[in-house]
Amino acid sequence: MAASGEPQRQWQEEVAAVVVVGSCMTDLVSLTSRLPKTGETIHGHKFFIGFGGKGANQCVQAARLGAMTSMVCKVGKDSFGNDYIENLKQNDISTEFTYQTKDAATGTASIIVNNEGQNIIVIVAGANLLLNTEDLRAAANVISRAKVMVCQLEITPATSLEALTMARRSGVKTLFNPAPAIADLDPQFYTLSDVFCCNESEAEILTGLTVGSAADAGEAALVLLKRGCQVVIITLGAEGCVVLSQTEPEPKHIPTEKVKAVDTTGAGDSFVGALAFYLAYYPNLSLEDMLNRSNFIAAVSVQAAGTQSSYPYKKDLPLTLF
């Protein structure tokens, strides 16, 4: 059932409801018929430069759905960094706490995408790794007044941990995406996560279990739940996602409709950004309903090339989602 009317905005208009503490990457994308083997040079048929980075991707998707957003991040004092700040502004994202540094280049992601929409990616985090706790403290006011705070692991883990700690202290709902995953993740990441959302390969790294099906994902999610998260979501690409929580520890599979994927790059970030939007603006929806809607939005994103360029706007989506 569609939520009635516009979201209730009881807070002041200029306050960001969704704050993302995370990464900005310039995507350097090559489209090829297939992925190259080790030591092989192959011809691609198209190259383009786009905007990516898990943090900014998630923020852009939330903003395009209508969320008031703020991005806490660090880019280089270079042309990629300048262009990135302009991109955030074009998406109506507050850049008050988008820092620039001379000490490192803006982060980059070299991405190769085949005809099936599968990809391989190498990231060089650059300036992202210089975002520090001092920068977070300068942004404390915007973090403490948010409805939802989102972070990932493309910035220094200690910085993400500090962001989660600050949000939790202020009673702000935390949405943590442990990507890229690290096997020996600090246990505090689990206990500080109201919603812990990862994909199947990240779940494998974090738990040591094989995740090849929804049933496997349910078992891995249980392991993660026992580490102290309130809610665990494991996304399964075209198979949707699996969810469980402290209050409903029985794994539930939320399937998604089948679509023809053109480019799956950034689909997980579209999902997280959509989920952040629903958590902030429609907190009374059931979790299952939020996940169905987030699945739908992520499925729209894989039907176009590029990362943020494939993310839908509210005006392009069915009214039943809002």
Curated annotation (Swiss-Prot):
Subcellular location: Cytoplasm; Nucleus
UniProt cofactor(s): Mg(2+)
Enzymatic reactions: D-ribose + ATP = D-ribose 5-phosphate + ADP + H(+)
Family matches, as Pfam families: PfkB (PF00294)
Assembly behavior: Homodimer.
Pathway: Carbohydrate metabolism; D-ribose degradation; D-ribose 5-phosphate from beta-D-ribopyranose: step 2/2
Keyword Ribonucleoprotein found: no
Species assigned in the record: Homo sapiens (Human)
Residues binding K(+), per UniProt: D263, T265, S301, A304, G306, S310
Protein keywords: ATP-binding, Carbohydrate metabolism, Cytoplasm, Kinase, Magnesium, Metal-binding, Nucleotide-binding, Nucleus, Potassium, Transferase
Official protein name in the record: Ribokinase
